Amino acid sequence: MAKFASIIVLLFVALVVFAAFEEPTMVEAQKLCQRPSGTWSGVCGNNNACKNQCIRLEKARHGSCNYVFPAHKCICYFPC
């Protein structure tokens, strides 16, 4: 019984040591470039509608209403 317990403890210690030396994997963030929506018309006042239109119609990653002088415009974000 004591031999079994020492094997379990040894396996646990080996697992802890292995986990301590494991490097965390980091995913590199992809840069996004912005440009005004080509399908949006008028002043942008609804972020969700702008986002959906950018994603569905222009195949962008994201979209939002941003202030660009003189009004809010729908801006789409694409991978650079």
UniProtKB/Swiss-Prot annotation:
PTM sites of type Pyrrolidone carboxylic acid: Q30
Record's keyword terms, sorted: Antimicrobial, Disulfide bond, Fungicide, Plant defense, Pyrrolidone carboxylic acid, Secreted, Signal
Database matches in SMART domains: Knot1
Disulfide bonds: C33-C80, C44-C65, C50-C74, C54-C76
Pfam families on file: Gamma-thionin
Purpose of the protein: Possesses antifungal activity sensitive to inorganic cations. Induces potential changes in fungal membranes and increased K(+) efflux and Ca(2+) uptake.
GO cellular component terms, A-Z: extracellular region
Outcome when changing K73Q: Decreased antifungal potency and increased sensitivity to inorganic cations
Localization, UniProt: Secreted
Any GO BP annotation: defense response to fungus
Annotated protein name in UniProt: Defensin-like protein 2
